[in-house]
Amino acid sequence: MVIKVPATSANLGPGFDALGLSLNLFNIITINESPIFCISLNGEGSQNLNLKKHNMFISIFNEITRKFDTKLPNFRFVFENNIPFSRGLGSSSAVIVGAIASAYKICGIKIDKNKILNEALVYENHPDNIAPAAFGGFVSSVIYKNSVITQKSEIGEDIKAVVVIPDKQMQTRKSRTMLPKNFTIKECVTNLSHAAFLTSCFVKKDYKNLKFGCIDVMHEELRMQNLPELFEVRKIAYENGALMSSLSGSGSSFLNIVYKDDAKNLAKILSAKFPKFTVKILDFDNGGFAFE
């Protein structure tokens, strides 16, 4: 059995813990019966022995299969990790969603993405990454009576993501401690209005106006102070055709959306300016996790 789970970018500026989208960059997990339990790691984290000893995917997979009381053989898990860790690209969400979906498949349970998403909420209590990891596309989410309700819009093929990935990690939990506990009504209204406008742009595929929707006054500036180069990334992106430019999740990655014809030029400029950073041109994924 093979499952692929996409990277995701959340918040998108003002949509704190509510908005996210899916990128065409996947972790691929292969699970086969084996005489003994074993794990192989390739790609991101392959040299990290702790990922073998304390593997979150295996832990969640085992927890879910035990719930179904299914007697299972030993498995060999092969992880091809392409999503960078702790860079704001949904690496933990990919693990959570992938583990739950794999457990359902192995146990013969019908794959219901809504059910899997709500199961994932137990492990990550904000849906902005887990929702697009499940469904793909641009997703807005709310939590109502402890359940996630989502709306998905497919993203057009005329735009691409130019993602800047710094060499510095940024832990979401630590990043959240930097944020104020209270906001003014003006700040809240500003973010609400921009998040609503941004959502409308994605739904209508009116990408030329994305830059007016991705403005945030609650978290981005504070988080970007950990890596001041990101302010320059945003400035350069807008000077070279970016439709929107925002911190990806809690960082450290930065998401720039451009028309596809502008992607190579922006990536070239950003790579030259920030040689220590990785710059990727990515399509958007409209499917979410999938079995192959």
UniProtKB/Swiss-Prot annotation:
Keywords: Amino-acid biosynthesis, ATP-binding, Cytoplasm, Kinase, Nucleotide-binding, Threonine biosynthesis, Transferase
GO molecular function terms noted in the UniProt entry: ATP binding; homoserine kinase activity
Entry EC no(s): 2.7.1.39
Binding site for ATP: P84, F85, S86, R87, G88, L89, G90, S91, S92, S93, A94
Subcellular location: Cytoplasm
Catalyzed chemical reaction(s): L-homoserine + ATP = O-phospho-L-homoserine + ADP + H(+)
Main location: cytoplasm
Keyword hit for tRNA processing: no
One Pfam family in the UniProt entry: GHMP_kinases_N
Signal peptide: none
GO terms for biological process, alphabetical: threonine biosynthetic process
Stored InterPro entries: GHMP_kinase_C_dom, GHMP_kinase_C_sf, GHMP_kinase_N_dom, GHMP_knse_ATP-bd_CS, Homoserine_kinase, Ribosomal_Su5_D2-typ_SF, Ribsml_uS5_D2-typ_fold_subgr
Superkingdom, taxonomy of origin: Bacteria
Pathway: Amino-acid biosynthesis; L-threonine biosynthesis; L-threonine from L-aspartate: step 4/5
Function per UniProt: Catalyzes the ATP-dependent phosphorylation of L-homoserine to L-homoserine phosphate.
Protein family according to the UniProt entry: Belongs to the GHMP kinase family. Homoserine kinase subfamily.
Entries under PANTHER family matching the protein: HOMOSERINE KINASE, HOMOSERINE/4-DIPHOSPHOCYTIDYL-2-C-METHYL-D-ERYTHRITOL KINASE
Listed name of the protein: Homoserine kinase
Protein species of origin: Campylobacter hominis (strain ATCC BAA-381 / DSM 21671 / CCUG 45161 / LMG 19568 / NCTC 13146 / CH001A)
Gene of this entry: thrB
